[in-house]
Amino acid sequence: MKDTIRQLIQQALTQLVTDGVLPEGLSPAIQVENARDKTHGDFASNIAMMLAKPAGMKPRDLAEKLIAALPASADISKAEIAGPGFLNFFQNTDALANRLDAALADAHLGARKAGPAQKVVIDMSAPNLAKEMHVGHLRSTIIGDSVARVLEFLGDQVIRQNHVGDWGTQFGMLLAYLEENPITSDELSDLENFYRAAKKRFDESEEFATRARGLVVKLQAGDPDCMALWTRFKDISLSHCQKTYELLNVKLTMADVMGESAYNADLANVVADLKAKGLLVEDQGAQCVFLEEFKNSEGEPLPVIVQKADGGYLYATTDLAAVRYRSNVLKADRALYFVDQRQALHFNQVFEVARRAGFVGHPMQMEHMGFGTMNGADGRPFKTRDGGTVKLIDLLTEAKERAYALVKEKNPSLAEDELRHIGEVVGIGAVKYADLSKHRTSDYSFNFELMLNFEGNTAPYLLYAYTRVAGVFRKLGKGFDEVEGHIVLQAAHEQDLAARLAQFGEILNNVADKGTPHVLCTYLYDLAGLFSSFYENCPILAAETPEQQQSRLRLAALTGRTLKQGLELLGLETLERM
């Protein structure tokens, strides 16, 4: 609806330019927002106040001319002026009802991408394979997954890329230890202990350290035996990651792995091409690119080091190779990097170097989707009681157990297998939703008690809200798609629910554009609250007429489908009963 209103305003502006009321050459960003006070309309725009000065008119006078020039629209019942010159628009409830009827018949609930479909690379998760996944990997994994789901739902072609850390000097140490201690995948169930044992051996034995360094050289040279050992370790580590992804209900597979090692063959070419472009400067033996727009506190340009003095390559080199691959081989239109916001400088530098070097041959928009940290109750990065790293799998297991105990306390008569299933859905969903409901760039404190609460903006509340809608149809023995008739909006609670349902597509486009799943979380929470008010004030099963019952059932069905689809786009499973 906002796009419709923007188009109407644009047509009115064009008419006023033709009439000589407005000067030519204006290209304002037309803003349309939801009205704060429904008595003054459903949507509002400040366009008259934005253009009053160039028009040489008072805002209200320009607003009057804009309203007079607005084309007629079946979607808008009337437009009015409020305050100093706001334009307020009232939706036509019949047109709104028709849109919702159409959405109910549509697999995508009426949601369509605002612009043309694109090919989008999502760089997400990226654990270090030398160690087990820890809580620090949660945000990149689930935020990236949710945005990828939304983009696909809206029609984009999404290429997930798990840029795992599978290369570097640490692997020489690990391979040397694995060579000494050949163990199976099951035996290597604790990568943290394996890493610590290898590090202890490295620190205490000069012979072991020398052999480890030798394995790094052999690995980099492509020695077959060394590569076989490295591949075995990598596969074992990736299998651990995959178990975590499956528990998280994240759409990442082995086929999505595109680790650091995948770009090894191109790193020398990256350096050579930067040199050919005249971008390289040698500084203390290292090969660097200096960009004037990135300076230190003394005002000196910061280096982007692409090759160390000893000939080794760095993260920037690998990331430049990845940019070139994603642009020129994958032909991506967008590349979204879901990486800690503390890496903002690094990515801004890499993106600029890539542009200057001509590595972005196919026009590709590069966006660092940075995120804040997950902290403990003390406001510091989440750690174990002894200060160690919290394994992600341990956190998720505890969430399942806590949710299981909570559900069992409330429903002791349920079968054990059902209790376990509900506990897993609620527990994993609670962890994910608590994270996704926070603004991507904000830090937040992890709190099991809050996230497992059945009140407030939590996963348990929304999962229960969905079961409440599903329960209405279970009593009738019908599915969401088995309700006939048409939606008729009469009561205020019906209209409020309908207006929010109609915003689903707009919300998804916002998430797709900005990479902010919390917007979808807020929408679903609002929708659940509006349905609760509707359900309490607009009887469904005890409706006054069959037509009214059908209309309200259709509103309930669309609410149920929207809640289910929205939760699925967040990567949360739903339950038919709790």
Curated annotation (Swiss-Prot):
Q: Where is this motif: 'HIGH' region?
A: 127-137
**UniProt-listed GO biological process terms:** arginyl-tRNA aminoacylation
What InterPro entries would the database entry show? aa-tRNA-synth_I_CS, Arg-tRNA-ligase, Arg-tRNA-synth_N, Arg-tRNA-synth_N_sf, ArgRS_core, DALR_anticod-bd, Rossmann-like_a/b/a_fold, tRNAsynth_Ia_anticodon-bd
Keywords from UniProt, A to Z, are: Aminoacyl-tRNA synthetase, ATP-binding, Cytoplasm, Ligase, Nucleotide-binding, Protein biosynthesis
Q: Where in the cell is it found?
A: Cytoplasm
Question: What EC number(s) does its UniProt record assign?
Answer: 6.1.1.19
* Chemical reaction(s) catalysed: tRNA(Arg) + L-arginine + ATP = L-arginyl-tRNA(Arg) + AMP + diphosphate
Q: Subunit composition?
A: Monomer.
In terms of NCBIfam families, this protein maps to: argS
Annotated family? Belongs to the class-I aminoacyl-tRNA synthetase family.
- The protein's name is Arginine--tRNA ligase
What is the scientific name of the source organism? Pseudomonas putida (strain W619)
